[in-house]
Amino acid sequence: MNRKLSREKAMELLFGMTLNTDNCEETLENFIDNYESDIKELDITYIKRILIGVENNKDNIDESISKNLCNWKIDRISKVNLCILRLAVYELLHDEEIPNRVAINEALEITKKYSDEKSVSFVNGVLDNILKK
């Protein structure tokens, strides 16, 4: 199972959940039913843990993000970057299995793939601020 790919798919699913009203169970079920590659490559248990964890802790996660923004408001963050931040903040604050540096580095790699260079610096700054507290 590929944790890096699983984390990326979890972010994509979180993004999808911001665009529709499906809960994490429905989102994951639809994803599994429609996934066209080898599902064995993915850690479905990990993806489910991320989706449920972010959904259950969203207020706390968003508060942590908001407190660590410099001259920004959370509603100004692009949906993609917000989903990346939510995933990483969940791992930093609520998932002891993932080392903090891994959570940050993986978030930055996902940001490079799905966003732009300015966003990489932005995401890194927010996550570093959260880690310092």
UniProtKB/Swiss-Prot annotation:
The keyword Kinase does not apply. The keyword Transcription regulation applies. Transmembrane segments: none annotated. One of its GO terms (biological process) is transcription antitermination. Pfam families: NusB. NCBIfam families: nusB (TIGR01951). This is Transcription antitermination protein NusB. It comes from Clostridium botulinum (strain Eklund 17B / Type B). The gene is nusB.
